[in-house]
Every structure is written in C-alpha cells, then in structure tokens.
Amino acid sequence: MSTYVPIQTITLGSNSATVDFTGIPQTFTDFVLVGNFTTNQSAPFRLLVGNNTIDTAANYSMTQMAGTGSVTESTRSSNANFIASGYINAAGRSIWQMHFMNYANTTTNKTVLIRYSTDVSASQSANARVGLWRSTSAINCIRLETNASPQVFESGSTFTLYGIGSGSPKAFGGDRVVTDGTYWYHVFTSSGRFEPVTNLSC
C-alpha cells in the first residue's frame, strides 16, 4: 500500500510568474505535485526540474493526449528547454496533478505523468501528458513558470507536494493510521485493539 505524505504547501500571497520547490527529500519512491490555481491570462505554462539547480537546457520532451468528448488530439515536443505542462484558461480554475516516478533514482531518465482539467464550461476538457527529463540525476528541485509576461499564477493559488512511500504498517488497529514516510503511527481516540502482523522490537 502506497502512502501520500505531505511535504510542503505553497499558497501564493501575491501574483507570481514562478513557483519553486527546493530541497525535496530523497526518501520516497515517487512524489506528486497538486496545483489548484487561477491565472490572469489564457496561455500554456511550463515545468522544469533539476538537481540543486533548475535545468534550462534542451533536455525535455512531452507527449499529450486530450479530449472534449467530441474532439481528440495529440501533440509531441522534443529537445525542449522545458516540459509544456498544459494550457491555463483565465476564465476558470485549473486543477493539475503531476506524478514524478522514481525521482531519486540515479540510473534512469525521469518521467512525469501530468493530468489536468478546467472548470470552464465553454472549453471543458480532460488532458494527459507524459514528460521526460533526459538526465539520470535525482530530482530535488522543481519549478512551475508561466509562459511569458504579463501572465502570472494569481494570489490564492495553492500547490502541494506529496511524497509517496511504498510499504504498509506492521500492525492493525487504531482510529487513525498515518506515516511520516519512516514510521507508522496508530492513533487511538478510545480503547481498542493493537494487533501486530510481524515481530516488533522496541
């Protein structure tokens, strides 16, 4: 069973053309970035990643599939300086999810799955993209940036990073069972049964 562990949330207190996450822990198998945001201008936005510094070289590629229920399309870009992460419509709120797989691995190139939708009635669509960073370096920093001035992510937009750890708890029981990526915590709000499923040491 995989577990989502909140790492960091950024809520914009003012308009910004970039959103940066740095010092991403290397203790998870994957991580997921969820964005819930608005913009002042309908335009694409970009994803860049790196190890200690953001890579702005032509080391990215992207494949997209999209559909509205009546129309479908696909596009591809390669040898780009960023991953084109989708089109933001200024008329509504956008919900984005980016899933970075094996991000701490140092032997393979890095893949990210991007899914998003908009709540604009005139252009409702579902979109999926696959991005590739051609580097075997681990990812410990990421950047979202708007396409060009004067486009910005608007104040109040939120971006949350979750780590995904593999594994499962070594016991059953508790009203809530949570993990910080290293340890499991069984919370009892009343009396209950704690039942280990393996030998435990203390």
Residue ranges and their predicted role:
Residues 197-202:
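Extended Gly/Ser/Thr-rich low-complexity repeat segments
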